[in-house]
């Protein structure tokens, strides 16, 4: 039995082909000519998103390692940190990937001078340090209605297909990937009403979700980000909330390390020894 796709492939199509063990699916145009082939032996999925990785920071907390090397190019195991993220996105069928750069930008441009797994990475220079999302205003090659924005110094196995499906299912304007964060208080805590103690909670544990630095955003909303201004993703989240936009969180089920300090860099080095890619 022959399967083929006309136009764009949907998540339902992808799941169907996977359950049937179908690895190759041609896409045909209106004249029946093949213009693409979906290869599920190479890619986990084919997500209709563009991706932008923020790689312009100085990585000051990782000095002296970052004095001559930009943080995204520091190696975890045998690969640069950023390459794990690029290759993961490619495995989900993401073909339009940009990296915004500033500090030691020439090294990153040289690093991506050749395609990775057949995908050309677009390097975009920011003229000044513009925060964790401000430089996206200089990216002008979007093809899809949904844009994934992420920090380039993360070490994670987030499931991008689940992330995107959750975003679409809830018709969100923005989805923020989140990681569980537990705070354990080593003392007894008073339950107070004014000055009076109403009770005692012995060594409580509180569970929260923390911002993981990975976002899915409706492309049209990116125009709200100001030009040539230092602007963080948290500023953008607060703006959308103030406008009563739908901002949701997506819990990451796998591992996640923000490589911002020497301790986290060591954690990633230890973890990668036990992973198989």
Residues of each region from the PLM?
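Conserved N-terminal catalytic core of the sugar/cofactor nucleotidyltransferase
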Residues: 3, 42, 79-152, 162, ...
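Active-site metal-binding loops of divalent metal-dependent hydrolases
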Residues: 58, 152-154
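Bateman (tandem CBS) regulatory domains
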Residues: 1-3, 66-69
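Catalytic-core segments of class I nucleotidyltransferases/pyrophosphorylases
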Residues: 147-148, 155, 161-168, 181-184, ...
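N-terminal nucleotide-binding beta1-loop-alpha1 segment
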Residues: 38-68, 81
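Short beta->alpha transition motifs characteristic of CBS
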Residues: 22-26, 33-46
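A short, conserved acidic/glycine-rich loop-to-beta-strand motif
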Residues: 170-180
């Amino acid at each position: 039995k022959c399967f083929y796709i006309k136009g764009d492939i949907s998540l339902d199509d992808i799941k169907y082909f996977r359950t049937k063990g179908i690895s190759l699916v041609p896409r045909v145009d209106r004249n029946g000519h093949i213009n693409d082939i979906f290869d599920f032996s190479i890619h986990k999925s084919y997500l209709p998103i563009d991706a932008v990785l923020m790689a312009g920071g100085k990585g000051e907390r990782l000095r002296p390692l970052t004095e001559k090397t930009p943080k995204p190019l520091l190696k975890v195991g045998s690969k640069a940190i950023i390459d794990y993220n690029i290759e993961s996105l490619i495995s989900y069928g993401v073909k339009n990937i940009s990296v915004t750069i500033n500090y030691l930008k020439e090294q990153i441009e040289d690093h991506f001078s050749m395609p990775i797994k057949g995908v050309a990475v677009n390097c975009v220079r920011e003229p000044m340090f513009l925060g964790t999302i401000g430089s996206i205003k200089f990216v002008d090659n979007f093809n899809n209605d949904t844009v994934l924005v992420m920090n380039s110094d993360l070490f994670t196995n987030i499931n991008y297909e689940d992330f995107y499906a959750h975003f679409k299912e809830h018709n969100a304007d923005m989805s923020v990937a989140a990681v569980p964060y537990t705070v354990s208080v080593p003392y007894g805590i008073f339950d107070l009403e004014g000055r009076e103690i109403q009770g005692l909670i012995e060594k409580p544990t509180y569970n929260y979700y923390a911002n993981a630095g990975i976002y899915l955003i409706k492309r049209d909303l990116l125009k709200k980000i100001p030009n040539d201004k230092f602007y963080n993703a948290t500023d953008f989240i607060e703006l959308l909330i103030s406008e009563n936009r739908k901002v949701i969180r997506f819990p990451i089920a796998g591992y996640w390390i923000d490589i911002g300090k020497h301790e986290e860099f060591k954690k990633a080095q230890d973890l990668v020894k036990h992973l198989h890619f």
